[in-house]
Amino acid sequence: MRIDQSIINEIKDKTDILDLVSEYVKLEKRGRNYIGLCPFHDEKTPSFTVSEDKQICHCFGCKKGGNVFQFTQEIKDISFVEAVKELGDRVNVAVDIEATQSNSNVQIASDDLQMIEMHELIQEFYYYALTKTVEGEQALTYLQERGFTDALIKERGIGFAPDSSHFCHDFLQKKGYDIELAYEAGLLSRNEENFSYYDRFRNRIMFPLKNAQGRIVGYSGRTYTGQEPKYLNSPETPIFQKRKLLYNLDKARKSIRKLDEIVLLEGFMDVIKSDTAGLKNVVATMGTQLSDEHITFIRKLTSNITLMFDGDFAGSEATLKTGQNLLQQGLNVFVIQLPSGMDPDEYIGKYGNDAFTAFVKNDKKSFAHYKVSILKDEIAHNDLSYERYLKELSHDISLMKSSILQQKALNDVAPFFNVSPEQLANEIQFNQAPANYYPEDEYGGYIEPEPIGMAQFDNLSRQEKAERAFLKHLMRDKDTFLNYYESVDKDNFTNQHFKYVFEVLHDFYAENDQYNISDAVQYVNSNELRETLISLEQYNLNDEPYENEIDDYVNVINEKGQETIESLNHKLREATRIGDVELQKYYLQQIVAKNKERM
């Protein structure tokens, strides 16, 4: 079977490879390209690159990649024709296949695709009923009085379901769709006594609900006459699952990636108004708590999430619960606190679009700052709560991945407890550590190293200095750790504290992607080991290793009996100082030989 080349080109032009790959891979911008862990093979260091300019992807490890069709073929393990059809469905391009064999070879639409087609066909009918019929005039006036322009109504595909039990039913039946499938799609309801079917949505303003690819998979029908419920949503179906759907994600995804932030609101109406006001990276759940599936998808797009829930007690409680969960999941969490009793729609209606966008830009707090401001009265007047929340907030701050954001949170939170940021940092470092971490001895017990004072780090041997510098570079970058971890025998460390830190780093990087001292100290429960970690944190060393610098440290630690260029240069200078020509000649030959080895 063959597909017309113009169709293939249209699908390729309408499919952004960055959006496509982002559904499977968490990508980070590196220069002009994006990089992430390859979805086709296991790896710890990202080697999968996506070029937005060239619209291609490539893995430097397993060599797989290509354009949007080749990526889809690989990720779904399907043929080229199937990949074209799938991507065509994604961007609403019909794929006409010229069969070289009988028509039976042409793949018909799946039930899921037929369900989506039903939703998209009836949307056109609903839109017509709202904008072109007498019956829809009252609903249209209701929308216009609430700031919905004709352009916004068209952009969002808003429609009207007439007050008829068979409007949708008859329309779909005339189009040749199976009525039972329309019921399973959530467009119809069923009388369980006589098994007759009737419209689920009647006399309601219809808001289409789209999946991440922009396909309509459900509806939310809003009353405009005061009937209950206020909003009637599609039921759970094979194509509409609330735990997987974030309203407006299809429109907001590019802005989320560009701004490296997603803003979560309570309802889709707030999203529509916020988006119209100029806030383009907004989404909302469909009346449910943020699910694990939601969080997984968000983490593929960004590590920064801002909560902007209603300014009432329920909104505050939801913010605390949701924010705590997101923080535990390793995301950077921020909060925009709306004035009491207001939601985004009401704020925009009262103050206008410009005031709203300025408020959002200038009134963003870390979750820890928001939480302590909510609890401030209890902290101030209840000593038991003071201790409890001091520990809670210390733990919350320790979960933050950015050391810069941690320091800002320390500065913001400390005054609520009448302590200095340094004292709060000490609470994090010394009282939040979990179970003991010591290496095991031959009997299975734990050995605590002999005490060593911070001052003793100023009197290290040449070998210990190499160990310290080596660890410092490993602490700065996970990729460096992964590249060099197996190059060193831990038993070759002469400083036992450094040896234990080396082992701590192994455990730390097994669970974390980026090193920070607040997280690392939780992997030890020894004052001496914590002191060593803090000393290494404070140790000043060049940010980027010089050429072969780390290799030199590895050689020293492993005691390979090979002089480093640094030590040979030092000995050459000493031989020159004392005037020993033979030694000068010897060390110069050694330096030349070592430089040749590196070439």
Curated annotation (Swiss-Prot):
GO terms for molecular function: ATP binding; DNA binding; DNA helicase activity; DNA-directed RNA polymerase activity; zinc ion binding. RNA polymerase that catalyzes the synthesis of short RNA molecules used as primers for DNA polymerase during DNA replication. InterPro entries: DNA_heli_DnaB-like_N_sf (IPR036185), DNA_helicase_N/primase_C (IPR016136), DNA_primase_core_N_sf (IPR037068), DNA_primase_DnaG (IPR006295), DNA_primase_Znf_CHC2 (IPR036977), DnaG_bac (IPR030846), DnaG_cat_HB (IPR048453), DNAG_N (IPR013264). Monomer. Interacts with DnaB. GO terms for biological process: DNA replication, synthesis of primer. One of its GO terms (cellular component) is primosome complex. The gene is dnaG. This is DNA primase. PANTHER family: DNA PRIMASE. Contains an N-terminal zinc-binding domain, a central core domain that contains the primase activity, and a C-terminal DnaB-binding domain. NCBIfam families: dnaG. SMART domains: TOPRIM, ZnF_CHCC. A zinc finger (CHC2-type) spans 38-62. It catalyses: ssDNA + n NTP = ssDNA/pppN(pN)n-1 hybrid + (n-1) diphosphate. Binds 1 zinc ion per monomer. Binds two Mg(2+) per subunit. Residues 260-341 form the Toprim domain. Belongs to the DnaG primase family. It comes from Staphylococcus aureus (strain COL).
